[in-house]
A protein has these predicted regions:
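Internal metal/ion-chelating core segments
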Residues: 149-245
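Inter-helical turn/loop elements of alpha-helical hairpins
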Residues: 2-3, 8, 14-22, 27-52, ...
Length: 247
């Protein structure tokens, strides 16, 4: 039996999936959202298993392009070319437009197009993650900060992934030199869940910016099982070395 999973994640770009496909897609998506190391392999398996599905291809192309490996752009391009336009819905078409610009290397257009998707659906955590991280690569400005302030108003602690929004908004505040607010939001996010590495990253950024070597959540940080995570963990380790350096 087919069912939509968009009501769970507020997505309207996900294909109708059976129970197994729905579980596998959510697993792959969560792997990316939480910086797990197996997101690419899980998305690849989904595409290989059912090439007719569009959402797994959107996820896989995004993961390939997020690697910033120019040698792999052709792989994303081939996936894009394999999609039949008459089989997609309106929001999928918008995502594919984002990916087309991304493949072309036009990150400014990518960010603007993703922002338009978010305006239509401010609870699409996948689009928000893509907006947040691609914005970093083109340079953060007041628009980045303003977008996060507008977004967080549309979320509540009853929403799935609310702590992720807190972590990203914390980073936006930190980059806007408001370290007190950045700390409060990162701490609130980690009080909800210790699973988001980006919330840890935001907290570490605050400490780095203030040259503060006393991480108040050190015990919880030391409990992170790094075996689950991909390259992001190395970036956090780099921040951790700054602690040792300043000590």
């Amino acid at each position: 039996m087919k069912r939509k999973i968009d009501n769970l994640y507020n997505f309207n770009w996900v294909d109708s999936l059976d129970k197994v496909e729905g579980f596998e897609f959510k697993e792959a998506l969560n792997s990316y959202i939480f910086f797990k190391k197996d997101s690419l392999s899980l998305a690849t398996k989904l595409v290989d298993k059912n090439p007719k599905l569009i959402a797994p291809k959107i996820l896989l192309m995004s993961l390939i392009l997020l690697s910033r490996d120019r040698k792999k752009i052709v792989i994303a391009k081939n996936i894009l070319n394999s999609i039949k336009i008459d089989s997609i819905n309106e929001i999928q078409e918008k995502y594919l437009s984002v990916l087309k610009k991304w493949i072309e290397g036009d990150l400014y257009s990518v960010v603007e197009k993703i922002k338009n998707i978010i305006i239509e659906n401010p609870k699409d955590i996948f689009a928000i993650r893509l907006f947040h991280f691609n914005s970093i690569f083109i340079g953060l400005d007041k628009k980045f900060f303003k977008t996060h302030l507008e977004l967080i108003k549309k979320w509540s602690d009853k929403d799935d992934f609310y702590n992720l929004i807190l972590g990203m908004t914390s980073f936006a505040y930190e980059e806007n030199n408001d370290y007190s607010k950045a700390y409060d939001l990162a701490k609130l996010s980690l009080d909800i869940s210790k699973d988001d590495l980006w919330s840890w990253h935001a907290l570490l950024h605050v400490h780095d910016s203030k040259v503060d070597c006393t991480l108040k959540l050190q015990n919880e940080y030391n409990k992170i099982n790094w075996n689950f995570y991909g390259p992001m963990k190395r970036h956090l380790w780099w921040h951790q070395t700054l602690f040792f350096y300043y000590q």
